Amino acid sequence: MSSYFVNPLYSKYKAAAAAAAAVAAGEPLPAPYYDCHFAPERQQIFTTQQEAELVQYPDCKSSSANIGEEPDHLNQSSSPAQMFPWMRPQAAPGRRRGRQTYSRFQTLELEKEFLFNPYLTRKRRIEVSHALGLTERQVKIWFQNRRMKWKKENNKDKFPASKQEGKEGEAKKETHDLEDDRAESHTN
């Protein structure tokens, strides 16, 4: 690899090492060259030393740890105070979410959109979701469910819903065929 590619990377690491040494010595970091004079004062990210220590990597800075041992921060017995909210386990994994209820306005608008076109493009789904205050996923699932409902309603005439209705339909058809046969025989 040519030095053209390596030199910028090497200088970046030297600058980072110098900054780390300055922090370790308790010196403030120099302002970066891109710092704007008109920018507002920067806020501290961490309010306490304890919070700042949470983001440190003890396995990198302690060389005295035994090689076979697992670092302390990898143990599962860490206190909940050291876990960020997004790291905590969610509700019971087997529990389902509650049923989504839509307002009358949302349902009306979704129905109108469905009558116009039962399939949405991604762009239109985004527009509808923003207009109705729903997520894209909710709109997508509503349209999937509505298409299935439409399919069931339209297939009800073609295919009976249960075996009992099917038997009744066959009996009616046979009766109707017999009546047709009788009518044909009387006309001949």
Curated annotation (Swiss-Prot):
One of its GO terms (cellular component) is nucleus. Keywords: Developmental protein, DNA-binding, Homeobox, Nucleus, Transcription, Transcription regulation. It is found in: Nucleus. Transmembrane segments: none annotated. The keyword Transcription regulation applies. The keyword Ribonucleoprotein does not apply. This is Homeobox protein Hox-D8. The gene is HOXD8.
